[in-house]
Amino acid sequence: MFKTLKKLFDNEYKELYRFSKLADQIDALDEEMSKLSDKKLASYTDKFKKRLEEGETLDDILVEAFAVAREAAYRCLGMKPFYCQLLGGLAIHYGNIAEMKTGEGKTLTCVLPAYLNALTGKGVHIVTVNEFLSTRDSEWMGIFKFLGLTVGLNLRELSFKEKQEAYNCDILYSTNNELGFDYLRDNMVVKKENRVQRPLNYCIVDEVDSILIDEARTPLIISGGVMQSANLYIDADRYVKSLKENEDYIMDEKSKAVSLTDEGSRKAEEHFHLDNLYDINNTALVHHINQALKANYAMSLDVDYVVQDGEVVIVDQFTGRLMKGRAFSDGLHQAIEAKEGVKIQQETKTLATITFQNYFRMYNKIAGMTGTAKTEEEEFRNIYNMFVIQIPTNKPVIREDATDLLYPGKEGKYNAIIKEIENRHATGQPVLVGTIAIETSELLSKMLTKKKIPHEVLNAKNHAREAEIIAHAGEKGAVTIATNMAGRGTDIKLGEGVKELGGLCVIGSERHESRRIDNQLRGRSGRQGDPGFTQFFVSFEDDLLVRFGSDRYKDMLKNLGFTGDMAIQNKMFSKTVESAQRKVEGNNFDIRKQLLNYDDVMNNQREIIYGKRNEILDNDSIHETVLNGFKEYISDIVNSHLVESNKLKENDYSEILEAVNENLLRKYRINLSEINGKHPSEVIDLIYENALKDYEEKLEDIPEEVRDEFEKAISLRVIDNYWMEHISTMSHLRDGIGLRGYANTSPLQAYTMEGYQLFDEMIAKINRDISIYLLKSEIRQNIERKQVAKTAITNDSKDHAKVQKKSTKVGRNDPCPCGSGKKYKNCCGK
């Protein structure tokens, strides 16, 4: 009965049933396709394109297109996609995630939907987590070239012309980072011909869970350098190092948040010679202290970062790789440099930013593939509208997954791991040990060295040999220690005689916060029906159980004499571990969802600004838009005097005149008698008419093309300057918005409302400055459009673009920069 209900209501079952019917039809064409000549098989591409032009849909040609691509794969590579790979390809075509076990041929699977969707001519992006995989997978391009399609490879070092050529190909292989950075750079160009991307159509994301889940909280940032005194970081670090936990500062183990106590604040005032640490003039110092606290007590050497060649280098928490050239933001990187006593680098200012969540949601259709996604299906469905379809394996999985071994402490656990490795190594069985932290991999390495057991260590410190180490990890007698499953994306193939020894033995040194990461480690063994064995060793001292485990079980076992090297292998305790993992997964999902809610505010604003930029770049003339901007600025000046009532007072007229005569009007200035007593709308119309006369006279002898270039150059520069500042302002707003919860106010609601208020103010300032510059600047021939900062260098490079800062001192009798029309001394300068 329950199986019947599952068939009726389970989306995955229904989809697999539908795909199997289509796969049968594709399979039925196999013999027909195999009889065709190469020329005739390749000619199908043009036939398919013509049918699409005549109004047929991709679904109409799907069966034939898959059959053609399947046969082409066999002729080019000698590999014909299995039936299960047809199912995976169909799942991907329909915008789902195909969960396929390690070794089931995901790379070959994606050839089928990529070919079909490339026939539209709108472009297909195949996305990988690093350039090694992009380069490796693009070698499959022979299939596409055989079928008459163009294929590009998007690498970081390409020039913009080479990138344009790559993006114009039917199929593009790229990393997720490079796609995102290209998008941001495209929205900072000052000429449309310098863009590289086409409209985003369809993408297939390999290791989709890594990119859309693990990296979802990490924004892509293009940044420029900002000078900040290194002494302040050093002084804050010196002060923080003198503090005592629980007396001067407290740390939340779950969130890793660190904050000063009252006593810590008192000591800060004493150290920095202040009356009140939290005085408004000390906000920069408080920020430096907070970052120093985080650097010293929440960030760990060889876990979150390493020190290499006198530099702090970030460790990717999900891949274990070093992220050379990248820097923690908001001064945290500099605080860590002060902590470790290395040279303090220049701080950065954000010029453009986007998260992967919002970037990938811009595609018309998105799909993915991975070996582990089912545990995160709710998140994929809610955020990306993708279902996870578990594709049956070509051969049954015969790997043995043993129940966890639980130890009282880490010492006993590590001794047991070494003994297990020793026993299996003695038989010649290859062993792969997965660790979470670099320090664990190095500790186990030292213990193995003492036992004189030859082994390889694969972590962020030696990832250059990754492919070589992984290639030999399945050979007889091999022992490999890998941090956070470095080497993902590369299969571990068993050497000669290893099957008879039981296949690859995988040992987990502790449970990861996510069951999905544990499943990835297990999945390294037992590929394509091979034998294998997996076992996790856990202890009550592991971070996961310290933070989320049950003290009740720990105390109960302690009372029963559970100490030292003793171990328990019980499903009840394994469920305790899984329960802790579910708590963390749920917590992390909530965090990512909340972050997306916040990021959506910024995303909507980004779309408006980028829309304005694209309008400037794509249109031959923006003259009408500029004139509308004049009127909006004049309306803002007049409306700023209508806050208390709908009528203008006597002194309002004189203040409005003072503002427009100084900032806008030159020849056609207005007298008080011309507007006194008039309705606000009449005042706006009169000022606008005179501004228009002034501007038209200014343009009298200027060719239209010069006028258009002048208006575009001014508009782009003003928009880009204000957008850069707005990103920083919104970042500061977000940093402090959490405190609103203490006032029974929703932080998200407050952030949304205040964020849009700041955005409206920015738009008003943009209209103001464009209007003033256009009316008061001298029009020059051959005016050059300039970017506000260099964009070729991003936050994952050692160097940073320099921000061109404009310093303007406002005089007491000058118009207030807020745009009110009042004098500075009577407005913000009071």
Model-derived regions, located:
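Extended, charged helical/alpha-beta scaffold domains that provide interaction surfaces
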Residues: 306-313, 319-326, 528-529, 541-809, ...
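Generic detector of short, well-ordered, non-transmembrane alpha-helical segments enriched
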Residues: 376, 429, 477, 605, ...
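Short, Lys/Glu-rich amphipathic helical modules
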Residues: 427-441, 619, 645, 672-676, ...
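Hydrophobic, well-ordered secondary-structure elements that form the walls
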Residues: 433, 481, 723, 759, ...
